Regions:
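Compositionally biased terminal segments of proteins
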Residues: 1-195
Length: 195
């Protein structure tokens, strides 16, 4: 026990924290195979200018069977070959697949309604250790961070200010509670035995 790293669930982690050298290594292999992907999440936030920690690499991928196969093949460059344990079609089926290898890589079908095709419309390619890597734009990241997760709040604050400074002010979305209110109304009717 002691100071070993832990994942978000508090379980001991066997993966080390990734860095931009990992982004370059994985990106080079994804590019070599012609896989369609865009970096989202923590590394994209860091690339946008917000210095923060991240424990994984988040990739939004095009969810065709062929592209998913290419992405998994590219990730087999990691030493434990954990991507080989992922069944074909898993990302399409489960929306997010976590691959725990030397570093943790999350493969995503979409986030907050943003899929690969949408993210690529304004993605920005940056050289990372000489490798061209597509990153989600700050506006796309803003859209993808509209969650109830407490850990997304600092990212939203940063992105809102960055977008405003860049001339693209955004407003915090007003949550659509109509569905929740309707369910509550029906539940109260059943509870009280009325119409």
């Amino acid at each position: 026990m002691g100071m070993e790293p832990h994942d978000e669930a508090g379980e001991p982690s066997v993966s080390r924290e990734p860095d931009f050298a990992d982004i370059a290594r994985i990106g080079a292999e994804l590019n070599r195979l012609g896989a369609r992907y865009v970096v989202v999440g923590g590394f994209a936030i860091i690339r946008a200018g917000y210095p923060r920690m991240t424990t994984d690499i988040d990739l939004l991928i095009e969810c065709t069977p062929e592209n998913e196969r290419l992405v998994l093949e590219a990730l087999s460059i990691l030493p434990d070959k954990a991507s080989r344990l992922v069944e074909p079609g898993a990302v399409e089926k489960y929306q997010v697949v976590r691959i725990g290898d030397e570093v943790t890589v999350d493969l995503m079908k979409s986030g907050c309604g943003v899929d690969y095709a949408t993210a690529m419309k304004d993605a920005q390619t940056h050289e990372v250790h000489g490798v061209p890597v597509p990153f989600a734009s700050p506006l796309t990241l803003w859209r993808m961070k509209q969650t109830v997760r407490e850990k997304d709040i600092p990212d939203r604050i940063f992105l809102k200010q960055k977008l405003s400074d860049d001339g693209t002010p955004v407003e915090d979305p007003v949550p659509d509670v109509s569905g929740i209110l309707e369910k509550l109304r029906r539940w109260l009717i059943r509870l009280l035995g009325g119409k």
